[in-house]
Amino acid sequence: MSTLFASVEQAPRDPILGLNEQFNADTRTGKVNLGVGVYYDDQGRIPLLAAVRKAEVARIEAAAARGYLPIEGIPGYNKGAQTLLLGADSPLIAAGRVLTAQALGGTGALKIGADFLKQILPDSKVLISDPSWENHRALFERAGFPVETYAYYDAATRGLNFAGMLAALQAAPAKTIVVLHACCHNPTGVDLDSAQWRQVAEVVKARDLVPFLDIAYQGFGAGLHEDAEAVRIFAAQDVTMLISSSFSKSFSLYGERVGALTLVAGSKDEAGRVLSQLKRVIRTNYSNPPTHGGTLVSSVLNTPELFALWEKELADMRDRIRLMRRQLADKVKAAGAAQDFGFIVKQRGMFSYTGLTSAQVDTLREQHGIYAVSSGRICVAALNSGNIDTVAKAIAAVAR
């Protein structure tokens, strides 16, 4: 007699989190995990930011009740997320055309956005960059959309294939949903410049496409305001859009699932109707978000002293990543790599697309205990003064 679940097949491991499981099972000393997108300090620890610590102490001392939040989350949290994205002087916010819902991390924001879009655009398709974050395709396919790609990375130049990207967008049918990495592209670290973003926004508007901007690393590229430039360019061109954002990395609150989904609507009335439907999506997924992480983020975003401290800590993290990029490029060269890895310095954010093949990545793991994603992506934020020499020598060895 077969059981209810007898026919259930074993699902493949997640390409990133599954790698983490392999790393944890590895008993070798000196192993290095460059797979998962987490920022570590120079001692190899996930930092607890001072601004977050102060907010948490205040939260504990207040002994506030932990009742249910509104479906859309904490008002101050949502207002803070909007301001970070669009600016304190945003005319769209002033006009009531912007709505935000607290979400379970950036992934949760993408999911509720995808579910909502499936309701209003059931016959649309989704375009993601080639390559993109591994979960983008699975997430939108799970929501019921066919997913295709647009050209993005040029392996020959280690840069952006902007002509190919524009051509794909210009050929896309109206109402195609286009997922765009607003800054610190994952996995390549290759971003568009201001002029290129303006061209993309013009094409998106002219072709009546639906931009879904994903910004999980605001502050890790050039700065909080600089990294929001793409969002603000679309806003300046009055483009209706969706934006998924995350504070997991920038606040070092990975386990608290602190994200937000922000939408720019055509009018205040439209924004209200959209929010009502978004709340229905949330209610049938998880009812409402948790209080703790959102309260900490809201406190920091809305307390000038804590905000200034957080911005300084974020700048320190950004500077350390830049230092690791420079040192890695120099040390790989010094170790005798056959190719120039100087392109790593030009990339932005937590990740680098090394150009290593899947076979070379396997060799890194099997022979050197260095774990990276099969695409060749490494998390530069996981490098430190204690492991960078080992990593550089291993990369040079497999790249010869």
Predicted regions and their residues:
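N-terminal "arm"/small-domain region of PLP-dependent enzymes with the aminotransferase-like
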Residues: 2-73, 80-83, 87, 284, ...
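Hydrophobic beta-strand scaffold residues
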Residues: 34, 147, 211, 241, ...
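Conserved core of the PLP fold type I
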Residues: 57-205, 219-220, 229-231, 356-357, ...
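Short Gly/Ser/Thr- and Asp/Glu-enriched loop/turn motifs at secondary-structure junctions
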Residues: 95-97, 344-349, 373-378
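Active-site PLP attachment segment
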Residues: 230-273, 277
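Structural signature of PLP-dependent enzymes
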Residues: 275-294, 300-329
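Conserved PLP-binding catalytic core of the aspartate aminotransferase-like
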Residues: 311-367
